[in-house]
A protein has these predicted regions:
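Thiol/selenol-based redox catalytic cores and closely related redox-interacting motifs
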Residues: 33-113
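Local sequence-structure signature of Cys/Sec-based thiol-disulfide redox active-site neighborhoods
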Residues: 1-20, 28-33
């Protein structure tokens, strides 16, 4: 099991996800999206597991508004903006190989353990 948590340092749900795995003594890797972002390969894997771009974007984020993403009609343009500005990701994104979740989802994570 190789758990990766992609999150933002000030996100409460990211901290809750960390706590969930710590309490169960499950090793995980924390990746700060604001600092390191997400590689294209990781992004494609997560997008396939989640079921689309719309579930990955945080439409309430300041970056989403500042970059006028809601006015972009082409999904490729939205993806480029998302990878350029990783703070627009909905967090936490928890990944276990080919499986992934967005948000605090302990009901799904317990099946991974």
């Amino acid at each position: 099991m190789n758990i990766q948590i992609f999150g933002k340092s000030k996100c409460f749900d990211t901290k809750k996800a960390e706590r969930y795995f710590k309490e169960r003594r499950i090793k995980y890797q924390l990746i700060d999206l604001g600092k390191y972002g997400m590689s294209l390969g990781e992004y494609k894997s997560v997008k396939a597991a989640i079921g689309g771009l719309s579930k990955l974007m945080d439409e309430t984020s300041k970056e989403y508004e500042e970059n006028f993403v809601k006015y972009l009609s082409d999904e490729t343009d939205k993806e480029e903006k998302l990878l350029e500005h990783p703070r627009m990701f909905q967090t936490p994104i928890v990944r276990n190989g080919k499986l992934a979740t967005v948000g605090y989802r302990p009901e799904i994570w317990k099946d991974w353990v």
